[in-house]
Curated annotation (Swiss-Prot):
One of its GO terms (molecular function) is hydro-lyase activity. It comes from the Bacteria. It comes from Cereibacter sphaeroides (strain ATCC 17023 / DSM 158 / JCM 6121 / CCUG 31486 / LMG 2827 / NBRC 12203 / NCIMB 8253 / ATH 2.4.1.) (Rhodobacter sphaeroides). This is 2-vinyl bacteriochlorophyllide hydratase. Pathway: Porphyrin-containing compound metabolism; bacteriochlorophyll biosynthesis (light-independent). NCBIfam families: BchF. InterPro entries: BCHF. Keywords: Bacteriochlorophyll biosynthesis, Chlorophyll biosynthesis, Lyase, Photosynthesis. GO terms for biological process: light-independent bacteriochlorophyll biosynthetic process; photosynthesis, dark reaction. Its EC number is 4.2.1.-.
């Protein structure tokens, strides 16, 4: 039987100083409000987009909802970058959130591609297809952030 080696030390998501800055900044509350709001708008918008694709009705409502979702995405990205600066000392790509930030740029690119399709008069089906692709990447990215939120909670429990 082979002796077992001790597990690699767990890398904490936040240092004590970063956790203190995270807990003290108003940008944490802003993110905590914007994230569920964006998800609510996403869920409504997804329903409207799927309704339009299924029935051919409701293009204006679907479009308006995608624009609202895109505005919220841009807002949460800007405020999230400010939050990272306050907590980690850099606007983007802090090691703790590097891959979430990388994937976020894909989400932004697809939402921006939707805006291009809308404002250049591309066919409605193409617009909605791009929106669905943007929404699929958003769901993955939201999952990344939810995972990090869980890791932060587990870190906090381990620290107590």
């Amino acid at each position: 039987m082979q002796p077992t080696s001790p597990a690699a030390p767990h890398r904490r998501l936040y240092t004590e100083e970063q956790r203190a800055r995270r807990d003290a900044t108003r940008w944490t509350l802003v993110q905590g409000i914007l994230a569920p709001l964006q998800f609510l708008v996403f869920a409504i918008s997804l329903g409207l987009v799927l309704w339009y694709l299924a029935t051919g009705e409701g293009y204006a409502a679907a479009t308006a909802s995608i624009l609202i979702k895109t505005f919220l995405l841009y807002t949460i990205m800007v405020t999230g970058a400010i939050w990272e600066k306050v907590v980690f000392g850099q606007y983007l790509f802090a090691p703790a959130f590097f891959w979430e930030d990388v994937f976020s740029f894909g989400v932004i690119a697809l939402h921006t591609a939707y805006l291009w399709a809308l404002f250049t008069g591309q066919p409605h089906g193409l617009q909605m297809g791009i929106a669905l692709a943007a929404y699929a990447t958003y769901v993955i990215n939201a999952g990344q952030f939810l995972w990090k939120l869980r890791m932060a909670r587990l870190d906090m429990e381990a620290a107590q």
